């Protein structure tokens, strides 16, 4: 069965290259004919590992391609996910499966609601990759991907193909708890790196601010029924800051480069969820307002 991959960014390209070199059938879906022509001129996807580049001539097409889609990896940004999924909805088989590889929360639920006949699996990944040019991606850090389905805990048989492709993964019966934990870590770190214009390690100068945010995030996780995700949150945030002290957060990099952030699916989603629960989150709300004002000042979308 063919893997269709929509989203030729860093993680989508990384998955496509590894699945393709394992001999599995893969097709990239590119947004329009102009993008397809540029891909064909490049000759395929380039994957750089340990300083060595390899070219993988993965087949590619546009969303209006004719072949039915049985399995789709959606690897675009959270704010593009629903529209991207809709662009190929007419091609989805009746029992199609979608693997949603988005940051934060909210986009996955929107896609699942838009495509009720399809099985939507959520994913949370710690793998590191970045684009080094058009259709060229650098594998920057080995990590792990957890996959799960909030509505069905039965793992699909095709997970063996991920092992065949050398993609470290685990099936998770509590994927939402994992995604909430990752969201909380992001909310405690990334917005502050933007507002203080610092590397992750610079947040060591703001321990009270970090502690106050973790306290509210812990309240939100407990109120949402994710007690395990709230456990040792502050300690883990400090550990992430120490382990990545020399790095700029992904949100800081987006803002610096004038790119839209995924704020609406991270800090924005946390604040909206608190409102739905009737849970006051004054520190998180203030942080969101400060970050939105900062983004508007730079001419960037604030949601």
Swiss-Prot record:
Superkingdom assignment: Bacteria
Alphabetic keyword roster: Cytoplasm, NADP, Oxidoreductase, Pantothenate biosynthesis
Catalytic activity: (R)-pantoate + NADP(+) = 2-dehydropantoate + NADPH + H(+)
Major subcellular location class: cytoplasm
Gene3D superfamilies: N-(1-d-carboxylethyl)-l-norvaline Dehydrogenase, domain 2 (1.10.1040.10), NAD(P)-binding Rossmann-like Domain (3.40.50.720)
Localization, UniProt: Cytoplasm
Signal peptide bounds: none
Enzyme Commission identifier(s): 1.1.1.169
Single GO term (MF): NADP binding
Binding residue positions for NADP(+): 7-12, 35, 103, 129, 131, 262
Residues at which substrate binds: 103, 186, 190, 200, 250
GO (cellular component) term, any one: cytoplasm
Biological process annotations from GO: pantothenate biosynthetic process
Protease in keyword set: no
Recorded family membership: Belongs to the ketopantoate reductase family.
Entry function: Catalyzes the NADPH-dependent reduction of ketopantoate into pantoic acid.
Name listed for the protein in its UniProt record: 2-dehydropantoate 2-reductase
Organism classification: Bacteria, Pseudomonadati, Pseudomonadota, Gammaproteobacteria, Pseudomonadales
Name of the coding gene: panE
